[in-house]
């Protein structure tokens, strides 16, 4: 989810937002429900200690579950009596392998990593353009296929995120099918197992449309957004909604976001 994090406006807005969320989160408590948290990257913090510390604190308030278990509970419309949390990460940065996966394994659960095959296979020029102009996240490197295959063999789920982190809210069906369908085929070829999960890039409901969602639903068993978190579903029940977070966020922020009563 690209953001111009270097702008003065963004920095001031983030500062004010942090203060408000820290106050609200101090008095918030995660509510019963199935919560899928979606992250992307590390920033400048010390890792994996920061992420490990966040999960240690969060585990005092919620129960961590496997990603596929969360999906099953949501799609069968279960109503748990405690807050359940599963994790996904978009874009396939190297910290998924180096940091996020090992820490999550310490809790006996997994996560789903949504990846872009052309980013994985791109030369440095492609990678730099992807980082600076597509996802606006500086100085990143993608996971390699051997690392992704290892994660899959360790029980992590690998999902599709289009070939090029493409915004799918257009009407060019040929391009949409390339970005959505071809992505699935490449992942399945590389991993030797079905790819059932798709998360559309950028995540807002306005950044997809009925045509692209229908193509995705024809191709994958499950489709995900990163929007409208208070509701389990969007696009008339076709899309499962996730809640954005980042591993360097304060625990108060997560406590506040998880305090919503989901419908």
Where is each model-derived feature located?
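C-terminal active-site subregion of NodB/CE4 polysaccharide deacetylases
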Residues: 2-87, 95, 170-263
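Active-site beta->alpha N-cap acidic-glycine motif
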Residues: 33, 38, 42-50, 67-154, ...
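Structural detector of well-ordered beta-strand residues that form the stable sheet scaffold
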Residues: 65, 112-114, 159, 223-224
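Generic secondary-structure microfeatures
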Residues: 115-117, 162, 172, 191
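Histidine- and/or cysteine-centered catalytic micro-motif in compact active-site loops
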Residues: 116-118, 163-164, 203, 228
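Acidic, His/Gly-enriched loop-helix segments that form or flank divalent-metal centers
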Residues: 142, 162, 173, 177
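Histidine-centered catalytic micro-motifs
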Residues: 157-165
């Amino acid at each position: 989810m690209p953001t111009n994090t270097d702008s003065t406006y963004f920095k001031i807005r983030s500062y004010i937002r942090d203060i408000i969320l820290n106050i609200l989160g101090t008095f918030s408590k995660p509510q019963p429900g199935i919560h899928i948290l979606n992250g992307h990257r590390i920033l400048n913090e010390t890792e994996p200690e920061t992420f490990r510390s966040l999960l240690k604190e969060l585990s005092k308030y919620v129960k961590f579950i496997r990603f596929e278990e969360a999906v099953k509970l949501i799609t069968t419309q279960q109503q748990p009596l405690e807050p359940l949390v599963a994790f996904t990460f978009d874009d396939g940065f190297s910290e998924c392998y180096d940091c996020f996966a090992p820490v999550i394994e310490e809790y006996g659960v997994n996560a789903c990593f949504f990846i872009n095959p052309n980013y994985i296979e791109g030369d440095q020029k492609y990678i730099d353009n992807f980082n600076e102009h597509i996802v606006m996240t500086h100085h990143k490197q993608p996971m390699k296929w051997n690392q992704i295959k290892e994660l899959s063999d360790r029980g992590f789920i690998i999902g599709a995120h289009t070939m090029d982190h493409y915004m799918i809210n257009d009407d060019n069906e040929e391009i949409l099918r390339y970005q959505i369908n071809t992505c699935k085929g490449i992942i399945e070829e590389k991993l030797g197992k079905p790819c059932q999960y798709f998360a559309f890039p950028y995540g807002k409901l306005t950044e997809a449309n009925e045509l692209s969602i229908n193509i995705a639903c024809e191709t994958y068993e499950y489709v995900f957004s990163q929007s409208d978190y208070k509701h389990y579903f969007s696009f008339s029940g076709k899309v499962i909604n996730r809640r954005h977070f980042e591993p360097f966020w304060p625990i108060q922020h997560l406590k506040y976001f998880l305090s919503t009563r989901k419908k």
